């Protein structure tokens, strides 16, 4: 595979739409700990940006054409991000103005997690592994490979 400094190296990179990409860059950095990778300005405004967190990446684009910011209280997708300390992450997100949808909770599949909404209406679940759990314990079946 050819390396390209203009593109994230992650295998899957979601692209999220925001009304104001610059404000989204600032918010995701402050509230969720993302690190800016690059930004592109066209017509005097940031229209594209990339951010990293851990080994993952996201791209962001400005609303326009068929791409619209989510409206309402339902979503068809959300991002799940693993962090080292979910309680500390939760406190940071809350202090920086993230809308908390679900407070930290221990889940039967071995993670502690919370869910928040960002300034663009995107939902994010942040989790921390707290114990190793056999998937069968919580009702999952491991696929044959």
Predicted feature residues:
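Short acidic-aromatic low-complexity motifs
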Residues: 18-22
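C-terminal catalytic core of tyrosine-transesterase DNA break-rejoin enzymes
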Residues: 120
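Vicinal oxygen chelate
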Residues: 1-15, 25-117, 126-145
């Amino acid at each position: 595979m050819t390396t390209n400094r203009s593109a994230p190296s992650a295998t899957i990179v979601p692209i999220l739409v925001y009304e104001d990409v610059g404000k989204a860059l600032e918010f995701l950095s402050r509230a969720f700990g993302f690190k800016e990778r690059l930004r592109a300005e066209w017509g005097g405004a940031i229209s594209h940006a990339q951010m990293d967190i851990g080994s993952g990446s996201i791209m962001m684009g400005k609303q326009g054409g068929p791409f619209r910011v989510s409206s309402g209280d339902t979503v068809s997708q959300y991002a799940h991000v693993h962090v080292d300390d979910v309680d500390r992450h939760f406190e940071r997100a809350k202090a920086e103005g993230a809308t908390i949808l679900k407070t930290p909770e221990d889940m039967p599949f071995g993670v502690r997690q919370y869910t928040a909404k960002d300034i663009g209406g995107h939902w994010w679940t942040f989790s921390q592994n707290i114990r190793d759990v056999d998937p069968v314990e919580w009702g999952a079946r491991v696929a044959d490979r």
